[in-house]
Amino acid sequence: MLSLYRYDSFNAMTFDLDASVVKDQAKAFGADLVGVVSAKTLNEFPPDPKWPQTPERISTHTKSVIVIAKRIPAGAFRAKSNIPVQYMDMLVLRQMDKAAYRLTEWLELEGHPSFVTAAQETDWSYKNASYGRLSTRHLGIEAGLGTFGLEVNILTPEFGPRIYLTGILTEAVIEADQRITEQVCIGESCSRCLYSCPSDAVRHFGIDKRACATEAQEFGFTTILQYWEHFIRQDADTMRALLRDREMFGFWQGLLRVVGSFGDCPRCLAVCPVGNDYHAHLADIQKVIPEKTPEKVEKAKGFKTARKNNEPIDGLNDWNARWVGPDGYQGMVARQLQAFKKEQREKEEAASAAASED
């Protein structure tokens, strides 16, 4: 059996399951990244204390949360429109949910009640449906998978922001991972996410959700409400015409395949230079950012100056700094790029040597 005693003879805490075994199982089921965080930590540090997104509000029995991530294949970010990314996201989420479900089944077979929450749904009672019951971004950070970027996506060293996450809440006590305290995001001196945002929604380690949604959810909930409010005020002929226009077709497509209604504008994800997937597949095509303007450049300079002068910044206050990386940026992306280039050289040299032997 994999289960261990909860306490040893000295009353020091041990664990119900070996964390490495749990992670191996999760990866065997399809997870690309796996981390563990204690429910106690999540309960003590809710993202927004006014609207606590904590395990204890869902189940008081939860002891640990296993966080799994699936990467979004980089090829979708080379397409000309959002649609390939949105459809690929749907496929990624399906695979992520399957992996989470299979891990939940395995945990219960080991004797530990477990369940998965809906990762991409929000709750109407949580700040007008702008929050879910848990913040998967914060779960990932607390589980040691990454830190916030300037646009407050979670950035992982492996795949940057090009991932989706979910959490398995379990009654098993599992050793938690350490948070990454180095800031993964290059920050204000990069600002590529800010430059690329078509709705100028990026704030200083924050996001204007309403502005973001105008691009991320072309056929989302707010758009549907506005459409029908407009529709019911029209005469019969106009109503018939509206039922046959592009927006109605978009709503139908969204119901069937999520495309257009899913919350994802891929621009900030596509241009982020964090992760070897960017260096391998995106650096060439995303080098130039068409949306970059002098106004956005000045905005980024203002962010940099504010941080240098230790001015008050909501996204970097004492509470939020925990998830940005309290140690600041120390060159992680540069180190990654050097390692990636070295690996590529070694592969090319090995291939060349093999070819010469033939």
Show which residues each predicted segment covers.
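Non-catalytic, usually N-terminal nucleic-acid engagement modules in DNA/RNA processing proteins
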Residues: 2-96
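FAD-binding beta-loop-beta segment adjacent to the flavin cofactor pocket
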Residues: 55, 302-303
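Short conserved micro-motifs at the rims of enzyme active sites and ligand-binding pockets
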Residues: 77-79, 224, 282-285, 355-358
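Catalytic cores of enzyme domains
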Residues: 85-86, 91-293
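Charge-rich, acidic-biased intrinsically disordered regions
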Residues: 224, 298-300
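Compact disulfide-stabilized, cysteine-rich extracellular microdomains and processed peptide cores
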Residues: 285-286, 290-297, 342-351, 357-358
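Short, C-terminally biased terminal segments at protein or domain edges
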Residues: 290-298, 306-315
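Long, compositionally biased charged/polar accessory segments in the mid-to-C-terminal portions
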Residues: 311-348
